[in-house]
Amino acid sequence: MSINTDETTWQTFKRLWQFIRLYKSGLIVAVIALVINAISDTYMISLLKPLLDEGFGNADSDFLRTLPLIIFVMMFIRGTSGFVSTYCLSWVSGNVVMLVRRMVFNHFMHMPVSYFDKEKTGNLLSRITYDSEQVSAATSQALVSIVREGASIIGLLVLMFYNSWQLSLVLFAVAPVVAWGIGVVSKRFRKISKNMQTMMGNVTASAEQMLKGHKVVLSYGGQDIERQRFDKVSNQMRQQSMKLVTAQAAANPIIQMIASFAIVAVLYLASIDSIKEQLTPGTFTVVFSAMFGLMRPLKALTNVTSQFQRGMAASQTLFALIDLEPEKNEGKYTVERAKGDVSVKDVSFTYVGSEKPALEHVSFDIPRGKTVALVGRSGSGKSTIANLFNRFYDVDSGSITLDGRDIRDYELKNLREQFALVSQNVHLFNDTIANNIAYATEDKYERSDIEHAAKLAHAMEFINKMENGLDTMIGENGASLSGGQRQRVAIARALLRDAPVLILDEATSALDTESERAIQAALDELQKDKTVLVIAHRLSTIEKADEILVVDDGAIIERGNHADLIAKNGAYAQLHRIQFGE
């Protein structure tokens, strides 16, 4: 599932235009204001001809007396049009960036788990933050310059040809060379911009890795290692930025040097007698000033090329990401509440990028209302089985059925509503305890339901000691709670969901013995009318399971209840002796 970034600038801009055109009212107003702004500049230059030919040459002329008023009016128009264009394009740009950013965020939420397994979190964050912000460069600053400077160039050219087409023809010799130069610079800018996106992703990933592992860094004295790692990626980002600045700084004088040949040629032609006879001081000054005035928009267009190409490179990356295939959801079958009969039939599965299967020909049944426990050493494939139930991954062969129907036939959201998962890796949101327990179902349950679930999970024991109780903000990933408290909140969330199938993946691993016993009693009560899959290292928590499966190296090597497996004196009995020191 790789990102395709082979689109041309034009193809990318056409896709971006589909977003821009949604706010065409603001765009139209901005373009009109920009054109007015450019016309005002051109008109100011055109005033040089009557000023020189009539103003100073005719003592009775009223032109000099009206000129201050004309200049005041033109500056007012110029200032007003500049404000309107900047505001409107910023409004358009802000909405486009917000829309693209939302699309990327929403697409991330529908990507398969396998995609996130191989992508750096920092790189993905950079797509939402840095890359989407770069789109603004192509929809505001760049568009302002392109329209305004483009209109200025057209206006100045019209002014030049109107006053002296002979002198103005010089531009036809220079224009192709200038266009070629801008084209070369654009390609360079885009290449560097893509590299900058990659480097920014690395910077974000390095910072995110340190922040998430801050306690480990402090505990092991890893500050120097992390500093060196961050210094390296930061310097790489700086180098790419300097390449962009160098290209931009070199492009300006080169383009202006090429354009200066036109000015030199005009001065030479103006000295030829046959042409000089047709020129008035005002005409020559207007043509020369207009040609010299072309330098500013040419410089601005060269500068804006880097902004535009940054925006195009970012847009290309974001569109390529949006084009990635989301997780498959081809099932149509839905059920309000499943009965809970689960069957795993000859399932094999291999993670992407791995040559060794994680599961091989695994089969077992969990009848409705029964509890099946999976035990075994770490990496044996226990959690993989739980992940397949929710279709975080799809089986390579075999099938998993719920109430006799393949889980791939279920509509994905409806399927996941039938399972409540408590993982060993608890994730809580930066919100209140109540909202974490009722996550994604805030409008479905009453406050009393949330409190009841918290009591069953023995979470109210510590919640009642907090000043704001269930309304306490717990910080990012429950930073203000202990490991055991976080796990009890996660258990309360699963209890509130009241799904027909309960998956407990090391659900009590972070609890002390007393809390574990209390919660186990609540779970025993809860499991009476539910199908339960328990993954456990602590064998004391699964002794009452209807069936225990011993998993090793992706295969089931033993099965039976606790008493039967102890009597067999096999792998389970050995694990039991190790844990209980028998």
From Swiss-Prot:
Catalytic reaction(s) noted: ATP + H2O + lipid A-core oligosaccharideSide 1 = ADP + phosphate + lipid A-core oligosaccharideSide 2
Keywords of this entry: ATP-binding, Cell inner membrane, Cell membrane, Lipid transport, Membrane, Nucleotide-binding, Translocase, Transmembrane, Transmembrane helix, Transport
EC number(s) given by UniProt: 7.5.2.6
One GO cellular component term noted in the UniProt record for this chain: plasma membrane
Signal sequence segment: none
Lipid bilayer topology: Multi-pass membrane protein
Subcellular location: Cell inner membrane
Enzyme class: translocase
Any one Gene Ontology molecular-function term assigned to this protein's record: ATPase-coupled lipid transmembrane transporter activity
Record: residues binding ATP: 376-383
UniProt xrefs under Gene3D superfamilies: ABC transporter type 1, transmembrane domain (1.20.1560.10), P-loop containing nucleotide triphosphate hydrolases (3.40.50.300)
Domain ABC transporter per the UniProt entry, residue ranges: 342-578
Domain ABC transmembrane type-1: residue ranges: 28-310
Positions of transmembrane segments: 27-47, 69-89, 142-162, 165-185, 249-269
Database matches in Pfam families: ABC_membrane, ABC_tran
InterPro entries given in the database record: AAA+_ATPase, ABC1_TM_dom, ABC1_TM_sf, ABC_transporter-like_ATP-bd, ABC_transporter-like_CS, ABC_transpr_lipidA, P-loop_NTPase, Type_1_exporter
Assembly: Homodimer.
NCBIfam families named in the record: MsbA_lipidA (TIGR02203), PRK11176.1 (NF008381)
Family: Belongs to the ABC transporter superfamily. Lipid exporter (TC 3.A.1.106) family.
Function per UniProt: Involved in lipopolysaccharide (LPS) biosynthesis. Translocates lipid A-core from the inner to the outer leaflet of the inner membrane. Transmembrane domains (TMD) form a pore in the inner membrane and the ATP-binding domain (NBD) is responsible for energy generation.
Record remark on domains: In MsbA the ATP-binding domain (NBD) and the transmembrane domain (TMD) are fused.
Protein name as it appears in the record: ATP-dependent lipid A-core flippase
